[in-house]
Amino acid sequence: MNTLAGSLRIGRLELDNGLVILVNERPDSELIVITGSSLAGAVFDGRKRPGLSQFTSGMMMRGTKKRKYMQIVDQTESLGAGIRFHADDDLAWSSSRCTTSSLDKTVELLFDCMMNPTFPEAEIEKVRGLMLTNIKEREDSTQAVAQRIAREMLFPEGNPYHSDPGGYEETVNAITREDVAGFWDQQCGPESTILSFSGRITLAEVEKKTKLLSRDWDARHPRPKVPPVEVLRPIKATRRVVPMMHKSQVDIVVMCQAVARSHPDNYALASANVILGRLGLMGRLGKNIRDKQGLAYYATCSYSPRITGGYWTAFAGVDPANVDKALDSMKHEMAEISRNPVSKAEHRDAATHQVGSLALKLESAQSAAAFMHGIEIHGLGLDFVDRYEDIVNSVSREDMRRVCQEYLRTEEACTAVVGPCQA
């Protein structure tokens, strides 16, 4: 029995200007969620402008040709709605929430922000200040610093995934209004944008509203292409220690290059990641390093497939006295899953976990609206959810062992150790 069949019905249309519209009708939901994405993430920042995508996203509500910043804020609040913008590695996102009664005004506000930003100089400086504060906070977090350093070691300078998406003090200080306006013009047109709607609304209603609001929104450039991520192998294993003596905990990050979301090995890596870091709360890593040995406050892992590349990351927070033992145990688990097939019970539980997690996720209009973007961006097909259970169940124990042997190579992993320890 396919437990996911029929759980996400998607209507799709593409307007003449290239804007893609996705609709998940939920007749019983008074809440409507609108999620937007554009090919305008950090991979487009360039070597000299890390942080530009997040800077641009931070400016999208800061004033338009029709409204000043506080007018946008006041009107959004008066509707009981919410609109926000942010950016990640590949994409710039908008997230909007409203009720059916406030839909028309909320959508008009959203389109005004997307189509008509003016990037006032005074607001540029406010957003710059916020970003610099975020950077200072990031650089005082042992986990955030460890993740940044591991990523910078794993992906060489010039690689689209080398730099922190939030930028650095010197690059954020150097970004100008012209940089922001130029980035928006180049990356954020309708030809680059997807809008998904989830709630009590039909495809026909969305088509009527979006055609009217975007009638003057013309495609300005060809659809952007995400820069390719060159995988340089063999990668030399690298370890870097950063002392932060005012902290009480050491954070360890071990990172390996993985694959793009569209790669055939994606599903096997995702299943292996569940076994290593999810089952039983924190997977094999947590069970061994935290529960059995008592070496860590937490130990887990994550898998991050992107449009043209990806990475796998193991994390642990430990007492300074346990750094070497914990790191050895992390690498032991990586080697073990690469040498020997997982148990039949783990294999079954990993598939059940993934199917159940998706079923739970799709109960939320917000999660469903975001999930539709992945389906569109990666070309998975509108029936992807119906096929997902069969896809996950087709991953074998040997598939998982093979991909772990290929990608979770301890001899190529980049390790960052940050906290009260000596370099």
List the predicted regions and their residue ranges.
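Carbohydrate-associated surface elements
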Residues: R200
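Short alpha-helical scaffolding segments that buttress acidic/His motifs in well-ordered protein cores
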Residues: T56, T106, L110, M114, ...
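Active-site SXXK
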Residues: P50-T64
